[in-house]
Amino acid sequence: MAQSVKTMVEGGKATTGPPIGPALGPLGLNVAQVVKEINEKTKEFQGMQVPVTVTVIDPETKKYEITVGVPPTSALLKKELGLEKGASKKKEAVAGNATLEQIKNVAIKKMPSMLAKDLKSAVLEVLGTCVAMGINVEGKDPKEVQKLIKSGQIKIEQ
């Protein structure tokens, strides 16, 4: 039976210490080799927490598979906009201002793990996160941008 270890690691900076080392040790894997592979697969997400799953396919041969998830939408937005954090009181403060192009970039990165069937739906989902984080889009409230997209006044091209 395949055993799995799921954890969150900082992109490109996993170590043999907790949480990975103690979780993989009992499975008999070469922890240093697994960590090296995780860092290689997550380097594009540096500075962000990334979900990682290590599945031992065959305990006899120690064959394993590493699956890297997509960081949370909020982490992708913070990286795209160079923000430390979102606004703590979104009604009073604006954490940042994004372009529609930046929102599309985040949506494209996030789409594999979203339920959205097309880019337009993914962009609307990312705009929802912008609302929660206090991020304006093109100087407007993200809810307003969502309405403009739904009404067809703003077109989202693939």
UniProtKB/Swiss-Prot annotation:
Belongs to the universal ribosomal protein uL11 family. NCBIfam families: PRK01143.1. Keywords: Ribonucleoprotein, Ribosomal protein, RNA-binding, rRNA-binding. GO terms for cellular component: large ribosomal subunit. It holds the Pfam family Ribosomal_L11_N. The keyword DNA-binding does not apply. Part of the ribosomal stalk of the 50S ribosomal subunit. Interacts with L10 and the large rRNA to form the base of the stalk. L10 forms an elongated spine to which L12 dimers bind in a sequential fashion forming a multimeric L10(L12)X complex. Residues 1-21 are annotated as: Disordered. Forms part of the ribosomal stalk which helps the ribosome interact with GTP-bound translation factors. InterPro entries: Ribosomal_uL11, Ribosomal_uL11_C, Ribosomal_uL11_C_sf, Ribosomal_uL11_N, Ribosomal_uL11_N_sf. PANTHER family: 60S RIBOSOMAL PROTEIN L12, LARGE RIBOSOMAL SUBUNIT PROTEIN UL11M. GO terms for biological process: translation. HAMAP family: Ribosomal_uL11. GO terms for molecular function: large ribosomal subunit rRNA binding; structural constituent of ribosome. This is Large ribosomal subunit protein uL11. The keyword Ribonucleoprotein applies.
